A protein has these predicted regions:
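Core AdoMet radical
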Residues: 29-41, 54-69, 81-99, 111-143, ...
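Flexible mid-to-C-terminal extensions adjoining Fe-S/redox cofactors in radical SAM and related proteins
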Residues: 241-294
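Short, charged low-complexity linear segments at domain edges
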Residues: 1-9, 231-255
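Canonical Radical SAM [4Fe-4S] cluster-binding loop centered on the CxxxCxxC motif
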Residues: 4-42
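Flexible, acidic/Gly-rich N-terminal and inter-domain linker regions that tether
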Residues: 1-11, 23, 203-204, 208, ...
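Conserved C-terminal portion of the radical SAM core fold
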Residues: 59, 114-118, 140-202, 213-235
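Short Fe-S-cluster ligation motifs
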Residues: 47-67, 286-294
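Distinct, well-ordered alpha-helical segments
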Residues: 71-78, 99-109, 168-176
Length: 294
């Protein structure tokens, strides 16, 4: 895989560390491969860190599953801390390998309290989570990983990718977070990227935002009323009710972010997430907002 140069002018500086993954999520935008790539990418990423601009605000570590690097992930984090002391680290992981407390402590410690862990929760119900993750016991291992991260006082971004198998339970997920995961730093409800496995499993997993907005509305406001920080990623403002706009983030990496012809006359375009260039089709129901009227 050819990695993009690290650049302080972009909103996405990422170290891709492996195409391997111990999950096989039904909507994965970058399906895993059985590639013997960890050592090669590790050496490549060490060099990229050494040559990176020193003013990067944040750098991502992603895959595949970064924790499959084992101790090499810790070495990578230490190298970032040494070479880029002012840069935060954002690790995207399914969280399962953080079930090992000793390993979790070492990863968190290496980051010197400047790591954000982006961890997915697919459902409050273990069966649905495991189906979506494509792996048995994924739910229990992820939950154990989340608790271990919390015990290490890690910063946790809980990610809920909305799909056909979980959108009916969005409010239940919010209640589950309140009762069982009150330590997460924030929760992000995310629109799907229509590429990779999401296309292959479209009939099973794909759902349009216009089908779940009312469920999302209830889930977001439930967490907000309980004073949990809550965000919405990857869903254009025109598809959200006006009361959800304050939660929407411009979350899409600039290298795969696009706005459509219908967006040209929209008064909220500058604040909107837009869409994915990587998606085979845009969301249904996109429209122009004039003078704030939805």
């Amino acid at each position: 895989m050819i990695q993009r140069p690290l650049d302080s002018l972009t909103n996405d500086n990422t170290l891709f560390c492996t195409e391997q993954c111990n999950n096989h999520c039904l909507m994965c935008c970058q399906p895993p491969k059985k590639a013997d790539d960890i050592d090669i990418l590790f050496q490549e990423n060490l060099l990229r860190i050494k040559n990176a601009p020193k003013d990067l605000p944040i750098i991502g570590i992603t895959g595949g599953e970064p924790t499959l690097l084992g101790e090499k992930l810790i070495d990578l984090i230490r190298q970032i801390r040494e070479q880029l002391p002012g840069t935060d680290i954002h690790i995207l992981s399914n969280g399962r390998n953080f079930k090992d407390m000793s390993y979790t402590e070492k990863v968190v410690s290496a980051g010197d309290r400047r790591i954000i862990f982006g961890i997915p929760l697919h459902s409050d119900y273990s069966g649905d989570h495991d189906i979506i993750a494509g792996c048995r016991n994924a739910f229990y291992e992820t939950i154990q990983g989340l608790y271990n991260l919390a015990l290490c006082e890690a910063c946790i971004e809980l990610r809920v990718v909305i799909n056909k198998l979980n959108y009916q339970r969005l409010h239940c997920i919010s209640e589950f977070i309140n009762k069982n995961l009150p330590f997460v730093t924030w929760t992000a409800f995310m629109g799907m990227e229509y590429t990779g496995y999401a296309v292959e499993h479209s009939n099973q997993i794909w759902v349009e935002p216009i089908e779940y907005i009312s469920k999302l509305q209830k889930a977001v406001h439930t967490l907000d009323e309980w004073h949990y920080k809550t965000c919405i990623y990857n869903i254009p403002l025109c598809l959200l009710t006006e009361d959800l706009h304050e939660f929407a983030e411009q979350s899409i990496s600039d290298w795969k972010n696009e706005y459509y012809e219908i967006c040209d006359g929209c008064t909220l375009k500058a604040k909107c997430s837009g869409g994915f260039t990587t998606s085979i089709k845009p969301y249904q129901g996109l429209h122009t907002i004039k003078n704030g009227e939805i």
